[in-house]
């Protein structure tokens, strides 16, 4: 699934992408460390990866950043997600984002920022269907906020 998503698109960086299985394992360990705030590079914040399984197979994954720094306020926000190409258009992104929002509530994140390209109509619909309120547009990027209060 991670291979099918590719290196990234529409602003989502597939940090797990690799042709090398051992490198993939290392990336999984690195993502665990990131979720715990261990060995973070200065520009990074803790983030947790969540997987969406349907019928016993992974169809997508999302990243929940535990808080924002100045960079993430302009690029990326709290949440990023991707669905494998063959499973797009089936409502899985809406389900995954809803689950990520629930996890953000568990982490006591009161307001969630999501960004997507203005041209990414599918992602805009997913965000809006999960309560995203468009508050700004800058250089072709939409800034949505969701209140968890």
Per-region residue spans from a language model:
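GNAT-family acyltransferases
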Residues: 1-78, 139-149
């Amino acid at each position: 699934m991670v291979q099918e998503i590719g290196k990234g698109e529409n602003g989502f960086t597939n940090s797990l992408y690799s042709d090398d299985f051992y490198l993939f394992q290392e990336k999984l360990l690195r993502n665990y460390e990131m979720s715990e705030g261990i060995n973070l590079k200065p520009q990074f914040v803790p983030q947790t990866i969540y997987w969406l399984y349907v019928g016993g197979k992974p169809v997508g994954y999302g990243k929940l950043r535990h808080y924002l720094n100045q960079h993430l306020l302009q690029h990326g926000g709290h949440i990023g997600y991707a669905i494998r190409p063959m499973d797009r258009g089936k409502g899985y992104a809406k389900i995954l984002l809803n689950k990520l929002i629930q996890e953000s509530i568990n982490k006591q994140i009161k307001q969630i920022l999501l960004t997507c390209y203005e041209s990414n109509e599918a992602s805009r619909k997913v965000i809006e269907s999960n309560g995203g309120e468009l508050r700004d547009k800058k250089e072709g990027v939409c800034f949505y906020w969701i209140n968890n209060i």
